[in-house]
UniProtKB/Swiss-Prot annotation:
Role of this protein: Binds to the 23S rRNA.
Provenance organism: Pelotomaculum thermopropionicum (strain DSM 13744 / JCM 10971 / SI)
Stated family: Belongs to the bacterial ribosomal protein bL9 family.
HAMAP family: Ribosomal_bL9
Gene of this entry: rplI
GO BP terms, alphabetized: translation
Protein name: Large ribosomal subunit protein bL9
GO MF term list: rRNA binding; structural constituent of ribosome
NCBIfam families: L9
Keywords: Ribonucleoprotein, Ribosomal protein, RNA-binding, rRNA-binding
Length: 148
């Protein structure tokens, strides 16, 4: 029996795939748990349409990420922080501070979770921070931490 998986099913496939399973397995396990539905002509057509829409959205998201990566190339963000002796900061500079500085200085809105900062910055200087804009696209943001 051909079924369309509504969720990932270990050993069978991922969400949206059409798989061939035993009729008893489908009726007694997959259907009651909402893991799959029978693959009728109407549902197959709807699945094809849904996959086309998802592919278009994914392509658009990737194009936007590439454009954002191009905008971030060559950008140096200056983050000002209070300092003590020897260039040590009072507190630290984290990804939230960097995202806010990007927004205020360059009008680039970037979610703080996309900035991959291993640990908060605690000294003055130039740093390179990776930004994961898309699963396939990563950009580098140069950050200059300066004293106030």
């Amino acid at each position: 029996m051909k079924v369309i998986l509504l969720k990932d099913v270990p050993g069978q496939g991922k969400k949206g795939e059409v798989v061939d399973v035993a009729e008893g397995y489908a009726r007694n396990y997959l259907f009651p748990r909402g893991l799959a539905e029978e693959a009728t002509k109407g549902r197959m057509k709807a699945l094809g349409d849904r996959q086309k829409v998802l592919a278009m959205k994914e392509k658009k998201a990737e194009e936007e990420a590439r454009a954002l990566a191009a905008r971030l190339k060559g950008v140096t963000v200056v983050v000002r922080a209070k300092t003590g002796e020897g260039g040590r900061l009072f507190g630290s500079v984290n990804n939230k501070d960097i995202a806010e500085a990007l927004a205020s200085q360059y009008n680039i809105v970037l979610d703080k979770k996309k900035l991959l900062l291993k640990e908060p910055i605690k000294q003055l200087g130039m740093y390179s921070v990776a930004a994961r804009l898309h699963p396939n696209i990563q950009a580098e943001v140069r950050v200059e931490v300066a004293g106030e």
